[in-house]
UniProtKB/Swiss-Prot annotation:
It is an enzyme of class 4 (lyase). The keyword Lyase applies. One of its GO terms (molecular function) is tryptophan synthase activity. Keywords: Amino-acid biosynthesis, Aromatic amino acid biosynthesis, Lyase, Tryptophan biosynthesis. NCBIfam families: trpA. It comes from Staphylococcus aureus (strain JH9). It catalyses: (1S,2R)-1-C-(indol-3-yl)glycerol 3-phosphate + L-serine = D-glyceraldehyde 3-phosphate + L-tryptophan + H2O. Gene3D superfamilies: Aldolase class I. Pathway: Amino-acid biosynthesis; L-tryptophan biosynthesis; L-tryptophan from chorismate: step 5/5. The alpha subunit is responsible for the aldol cleavage of indoleglycerol phosphate to indole and glyceraldehyde 3-phosphate. Its EC number is 4.2.1.20. This is Tryptophan synthase alpha chain. The gene is trpA. Transmembrane segments: none annotated. The keyword Lyase applies.
Amino acid sequence: MTKLFIPYIMGNKDLIENATLLSENGADIIEIGVPFSDPVADGPVIMEAGQQAIKQGITIDYIFNQLEKHGDQIKCNYVLMTYYNIICHYGEQAFFEKCRDTGVYGLIIPDLPYELSQRLKQQFSHYGVKIISLVAMTTDDKRIKDIVSHAEGFIYTVTMNATTGQNGAFHPELKRKIESIKAIANVPVVAGFGIRTPQHVADIKEVADGIVIGSEIVKRFKSNTREEIIRYLQSIQQTLNN
């Protein structure tokens, strides 16, 4: 099975241009961050990118508008990474309806309690927008079974107990945990948080069905040339599927 490559970008003025570049260079699914004033799950790089986007006037409406107009330029699935507060403020039903209308494949909602995710799935499944389950390394086995049994799209295993994009030191129990999740899962199990280099990818791909790279991609879009970004994406893609 081909391993999934899921890069993250912040929703900003360059959203469509950046997402198109990623989709043309090996991305299977793109995670689009919705800027939020209190992003509890984000590391410093993504937090700063979010603050910049807010200063640019980026809102969820702007992101929906761009996806509605130009989403067909993105040649792969895309998901929104957003906080529940934004969904609640927008109105749950209106939010899911808009996701469907703008081609959003799924939602990653890091502050969403499991019980609330179940209600949203039951209430809004007819919109066809998947709610992606997150599993932390600290989650106990019983809760993992509950989460996995209702998972859709893919399962996002959080490979560090720290916030995103830190030193890339993987939890010692990580591989065992991912293997135990895969044994009972009916959807791909991907690893994210702290993956930056081809070496990290080579290490984690032994067990995971794919990887998410966030902070490193955001950093490179800020400081690298288009050619440098493409070279980096190719190095990740080659390592992932070698």
